[in-house]
Amino acid sequence: MANNEESRGLKSLFDWFANRRKAGATNPERQEREIADGLWHKCSKCGVLTYTKDLRANQMVCVECGHHNRVDSDERIRQLIDQNTWRPMDENLRATDPLQFRDRKAYSDRLREMEDKLGLLDAVKTGLGQINSSPVALAVMDFRFMGGSMGSVVGEKITRLIEQATQRRYPVVIICTSGGARMQEGMLSLMQMAKISAALERHRDARLLYIPVLTNPTTGGVTASFAMLGDIILAEPKATIGFAGRRVIEQTLREKLPDDFQTAEDLLKHGFVDDIVPRTQLKNTLSQLIALHQPVPTTPPMVLWETMSLSSTAVE
């Protein structure tokens, strides 16, 4: 009897949460307070309230409409890398201000504010780990740090990661999300495009796999360099991917662009990406691709006369 009452009580509680999520809180002030406290998350696409714990369990993908919310670098690593296998690289690299750049505030002040607010030294985390027991070199960009912009530190960390992967014969996976090259570093940021591309070319010459994953947004100098140099290019659903911004292109061409312009779906249709993979399937997809492209062991070739000698011995 007690068990039945307990079951009915739990069912009522679950029904209340379900109705609350669909209908929204009746008191706007209470709703905003609970969202601010992090208990609930309001989807920016469909407006449905979801319990934050449930959203995280679904890898920050809305359970109602499938909208892929942005995730930070730590969360992305947790989603992809096997537990207790992550070994970060170059954690202490930090940007300087060689140009003494200043817009509304000094670049050095911006860097300090980002570090204090986020606990990050720059816009990418790199390291070695395993995806379903397969070794991998992984770089994860973080849009929270100055829009994921690519400066000297981002370029150096990714280049070092690729060089380490080439030496160890590891595949490379880069989770891309960026507004492009960092304007506060001028030409130094643009140099990173060529620097990373050269490292990837050496990695490719070693016949090793590179997979970029394009997430929302991937634009500017990142798109114009390593984001589009993959052996297999993956993208998340509805991700904005392009070089110049939509408004800039419309003003230049004086034309209205299609609604799906610069979306992952449009790029797939025109052959710029190879597949669109939902975040909840990304780890297994990467694991399968890595397993299919395991590097062939480098063994010294057998010279012709040795082959003939072995054949003669077999005949005798």
From Swiss-Prot:
<dbReference type="GO" id="GO:0016743">
    <property type="term" value="F:carboxyl- or carbamoyltransferase activity"/>
</dbReference>
<comment type="function">
    <text>Component of the acetyl coenzyme A carboxylase (ACC) complex. Biotin carboxylase (BC) catalyzes the carboxylation of biotin on its carrier protein (BCCP) and then the CO(2) group is transferred by the transcarboxylase to acetyl-CoA to form malonyl-CoA.</text>
</comment>
<keyword id="KW-0547">Nucleotide-binding</keyword>
<keyword id="KW-0275">Fatty acid biosynthesis</keyword>
<feature type="zinc finger region" description="C4-type">
    <location>
        <begin position="43"/>
        <end position="65"/>
    </location>
</feature>
<feature type="binding site">
    <location>
        <position position="65"/>
    </location>
    <ligand>
        <name>Zn(2+)</name>
    </ligand>
</feature>
<dbReference type="Pfam" id="PF01039">
    <property type="entry name" value="Carboxyl_trans"/>
</dbReference>
<comment type="similarity">
    <text>Belongs to the AccD/PCCB family.</text>
</comment>
<keyword id="KW-0276">Fatty acid metabolism</keyword>
<keyword id="KW-0808">Transferase</keyword>
<keyword id="KW-0963">Cytoplasm</keyword>
<comment type="pathway">
    <text>Lipid metabolism; malonyl-CoA biosynthesis; malonyl-CoA from acetyl-CoA: step 1/1.</text>
</comment>
<keyword id="KW-0862">Zinc</keyword>
<dbReference type="InterPro" id="IPR034733">
    <property type="entry name" value="AcCoA_carboxyl_beta"/>
</dbReference>
<keyword id="KW-0479">Metal-binding</keyword>
<feature type="domain" description="CoA carboxyltransferase N-terminal">
    <location>
        <begin position="39"/>
        <end position="308"/>
    </location>
</feature>
<dbReference type="GO" id="GO:0009317">
    <property type="term" value="C:acetyl-CoA carboxylase complex"/>
</dbReference>
<dbReference type="InterPro" id="IPR029045">
    <property type="entry name" value="ClpP/crotonase-like_dom_sf"/>
</dbReference>
<dbReference type="InterPro" id="IPR000438">
    <property type="entry name" value="Acetyl_CoA_COase_Trfase_b_su"/>
</dbReference>
<dbReference type="GO" id="GO:0005524">
    <property type="term" value="F:ATP binding"/>
</dbReference>
<dbReference type="InterPro" id="IPR011762">
    <property type="entry name" value="COA_CT_N"/>
</dbReference>
<protein>
    <recommendedName>
        <fullName>Acetyl-coenzyme A carboxylase carboxyl transferase subunit beta</fullName>
        <ecNumber>2.1.3.15</ecNumber>
    </recommendedName>
</protein>
<feature type="binding site">
    <location>
        <position position="62"/>
    </location>
    <ligand>
        <name>Zn(2+)</name>
    </ligand>
</feature>
<dbReference type="InterPro" id="IPR041010">
    <property type="entry name" value="Znf-ACC"/>
</dbReference>
<keyword id="KW-0444">Lipid biosynthesis</keyword>
<dbReference type="GO" id="GO:0008270">
    <property type="term" value="F:zinc ion binding"/>
</dbReference>
<feature type="binding site">
    <location>
        <position position="43"/>
    </location>
    <ligand>
        <name>Zn(2+)</name>
    </ligand>
</feature>
<keyword id="KW-0863">Zinc-finger</keyword>
<keyword id="KW-0067">ATP-binding</keyword>
<dbReference type="GO" id="GO:2001295">
    <property type="term" value="P:malonyl-CoA biosynthetic process"/>
</dbReference>
<dbReference type="GO" id="GO:0006633">
    <property type="term" value="P:fatty acid biosynthetic process"/>
</dbReference>
<keyword id="KW-0443">Lipid metabolism</keyword>
<comment type="subunit">
    <text>Acetyl-CoA carboxylase is a heterohexamer composed of biotin carboxyl carrier protein (AccB), biotin carboxylase (AccC) and two subunits each of ACCase subunit alpha (AccA) and ACCase subunit beta (AccD).</text>
</comment>
<feature type="binding site">
    <location>
        <position position="46"/>
    </location>
    <ligand>
        <name>Zn(2+)</name>
    </ligand>
</feature>
<dbReference type="GO" id="GO:0003989">
    <property type="term" value="F:acetyl-CoA carboxylase activity"/>
</dbReference>
<dbReference type="Pfam" id="PF17848">
    <property type="entry name" value="Zn_ribbon_ACC"/>
</dbReference>
